[in-house]
A protein has these predicted regions:
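Short cytosolic juxtamembrane segments of multi-pass membrane proteins
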Residues: 1, 170-185, 580-581, 669-673
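Small-residue-rich transmembrane alpha-helices
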Residues: 16-30, 65-69, 102-131, 144-169, ...
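Nucleotide-cofactor and metal-assisted catalytic machinery
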Residues: 308-550
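Selective transmembrane-helix segments that form parts of the transport pathway or gating/packing helices
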Residues: 4-11, 95-113, 149, 153, ...
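Juxtamembrane interface at the cytosolic side of transmembrane helices
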Residues: 63-76, 166, 246-258, 565-592, ...
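Peri-transmembrane interface segments
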Residues: 2-9, 20-54, 69-72, 214-233, ...
Length: 673
């Protein structure tokens, strides 16, 4: 019965989670969102459907594993049924009825729990998509219920079939004496265990180094795959070696080893670890994936919020990118962005706080000129030594930031500033700025105003992607420099949400390019090759960002929780199995006078270490894995990782802790029988 409690609880949680994430599609229908957001929600729902197939496979393996595991524990019971005259067909019928009852009850309870949780998920979804919930009501997704029933019904049918096969093929003698066949536990040579542990440490250590300090040396997926393989092999070797090392090390601590029943506890723990090398490694990896997936998903959400606040400060921005031909010979007179917009009959009467910035591409100022000596001498910066540095006048930048209340910059006549928020480029610039790197423009030398980059933008964006802009005094003559960008920024002159929505729709991609098509020559020049125009709104950038963020967050939570439940359930079943196998040992302890308090303390210590081992190794993996995740997440912004890790840790400790407590209580009952 104790074994089935874990099995039953896992089924209920599996059903609830499966329903919750498959009900998102029905819940988002009620949210009042823009057309662009609606498309992103549709894409998210399609992604969730694909992920649900993978989740169903994971849960299917878990259910089949748990059922097969429990069947092995009941072989003696079935042997007794056969001895009393029941046929294998009758025993098979009992199993089918049991599975049906467990399946129906777990489905009903799981769906009720899932429906309740999904109402809270609706609020989370609305918050992620910044949606209007005025039309929200209590929602039950019929499609999600049907999908959940179908998927889990398939799992239960497979379980029934396997149970019947096991009973029908088993011999009576094997069933009756199944309980007497203890799992063989061969003693391991401590010296071999130490050598294997050293090999595991080398594999893990080199993998940790490669994915952190040496991450830039990994150039392809094959290189990354090698490090992942080393981590997986090292994990299994740690579990194989620890069981033999544990007993050898503790035996040397004689005062501890011979105190109370510590010798019994240590041997029992070593036996458990020794028989769970494979499952312990799998559980550790599942917990590692859980920690990284949950932390990364939540970190992306926090980072995106920060990025959207700082990188979309104006409502709309028109950008004109010049071709190389235009940069050399195009006459800007009368052809700035505002003139182009008028020529295309694009209405700008609703715009205010208008600013216009020109970005130049001087031939004699290159990006690599601003890197420090360490970067410049590394030989890996050749591309940047030839790439032109985008340059603009400080006055135009100050006018732009003043339009949304940003911080302006004062430059002396011999100073410059580098504007950058892209994580990959900042260290390069900062190295040069810290060294006081100078730049010469038309014979005059300019010094850096600050020893680090200024965090700022000129293009609105949904990521920190400004790879560097050189800000120079207005007195610098750029008339003979190549044009690169002409950027026209503005806010809407209304705060009425209906009017704002209409303006966002008017300046959307489809409408903007449709208006341009009617005036192609006026926009692109006589030969159509001088430049291209682009329009971007903060609303569209936020929608795209929020849609991607929501998809990552939901998929991350979905997979993370499923992996966590799977790992905890497997560990719990193994622990209960070990407790059942050790009942006679605890009975002997009672007979020789060991009090119940010491027995319970021994069981608690064994269970605690048994649960803690895969979690602790998973945490060590995650310390290095999350550093790699931080490197990858620079594309989504920075910040919020600590809070995300703490939140993920809380979720893991709650679910993992619940499984641990249930397992300990059930194990205590088993050894007391």
């Amino acid at each position: 019965m104790q074994n089935y409690l874990i099995y039953f609880a896992t089924l209920i949680l599996g059903v609830a989670i499966f329903y919750v994430f498959n009900a998102l599609g029905s819940q988002t229908v009620m949210l009042k969102v823009s057309s662009n957001t609606a498309e992103l929600i549709g894409l998210m729902n399609e992604a969730m459907s694909v992920v649900s197939v993978f989740v169903s496979i994971v849960l299917g393996f878990l259910v089949v594993y748990a059922s097969t595991f429990l069947m092995k524990r009941r072989k003696k019971e079935f042997g007794i049924y056969l001895t009393l005259g029941m046929g294998k067909t009758q025993v098979a019928k009992i199993l089918v009825i049991e599975t049906l009852l467990i399946g129906v009850i777990s489905l009903v309870i799981g769906l009720l729990l899932g429906i309740g949780i999904s109402q809270g998920m609706s609020v989370v979804t609305a918050n992620l998509f910044e949606a209007d919930m005025t039309n929200f009501r209590f929602m039950v997704s019929t499609s999600a219920i049907i999908k959940t029933i179908i998927y889990f019904a398939i799992m239960y049918v497979i379980v029934m079939a396997l149970d019947v096969i096991i009973v029908s093929r088993a011999k009576l003698i094997n069933l009756l004496y199944a309980g007497a066949k203890a799992q063989k536990n061969h003693a391991k040579n401590p010296v071999v265990c130490v050598l294997v542990f050293i090999i595991a440490a080398i594999l893990l250590g080199t993998a940790y180094y490669k994915v952190t300090a040496g991450v830039r040396t990994i150039s392809d997926f094959q290189g990354l795959g090698i490090q992942i393989a080393k981590g997986i092999i090292g994990t299994f070797l740690v579990f194989w070696s620890v069981s033999g090392m544990l007993l050898a090390i503790v035996k040397r601590c004689r005062r501890f080893y011979y105190k109370g029943i510590n010798s019994f506890s240590v041997k029992e723990l070593g036996s458990r670890i020794n028989t769970t090398v494979f499952s312990g490694g799998i559980i550790c990896l599942l917990l590692f994936f859980t920690i990284c997936i949950l932390s990364s998903a939540m970190a992306i959400r926090n980072s995106m919020n920060h990025v959207l606040e700082t990188c979309t400060p104006v409502d709309v921005q028109f950008s004109k990118l010049y071709s190389y031909d235009a940069a050399e010979d195009y006459d800007m007179t009368g052809h700035n962005v505002e003139e182009n917009l008028k020529a295309c009959d694009i209405d700008t009467s609703k715009l205010t706080d208008v600013t216009e910035m020109i970005l130049y591409a001087p031939e004699d100022i290159n990006i690599g000129d601003f890197f420090g000596k360490a970067f410049a001498e590394s030989g890996s910066e050749d591309y940047f030594k030839e790439a032109s540095m985008e340059t603009m006048h400080i006055g135009e930048y100050n006018a732009f930031v003043s339009s949304f209340g940003g911080t302006t910059i004062d430059l002396a006549e011999d100073e410059y500033v580098i504007l950058c928020n892209y994580g990959e480029m900042e260290p390069r610039y900062n190295a040069g700025l810290a060294e006081g790197q100078t730049v010469t423009i038309k014979g005059k030398t300019y010094h850096p105003k600050y020893s680090t980059c200024v965090d700022g933008i000129v293009h609105i964006s949904n990521s920190e992607s400004n790879a560097g802009v050189l800000l120079v005094p207005d007195s610098v003559d750029m008339s003979d420099c190549d044009f690169w960008y002409d950027i026209y920024s503005a806010n809407y002159n209304t705060t009425d949400q209906t009017e704002v929505d209409a303006l966002n729709e008017y300046y959307s991609d489809a409408n903007f390019y449709k208006l341009q098509e009617a005036k192609t020559e006026a926009v692109l020049g006589e030969d159509g090759s001088y430049y291209s125009m682009n329009c971007e709104t903060s609303k569209r950038l936020r929608d795209n960002s929020v849609g991607l963020t929501a998809m990552i967050v939901f998929i991350g939570i979905y997979l993370g929780v499923v992996f966590l439940i799977s790992g905890a359930a497997i560990l719990s079943l193994k622990e209960l199995s070990e407790a059942a196998d050790s009942k006679e040992k605890y009975r002997i302890l009672r007979r020789i006078g060991v009090d119940e308090k010491k027995i319970r303390h021994s069981l608690l210590a064994q269970s605690g270490v048994f649960f803690a081992m895969p979690l602790l190794l998973a945490i060590v993996h995650s310390v290095f894995g999350m550093q790699t995740a931080m490197f990858i997440l620079t594309a989504f912004g920075r910040g919020g990782l600590l809070g995300s890790i703490l939140l993920a840790a809380a979720v893991i400790l709650v679910i993992y802790g619940i499984y641990f407590m249930i397992t300990y209580i059930c194990s205590r009952k088993i050894i007391s029988e």
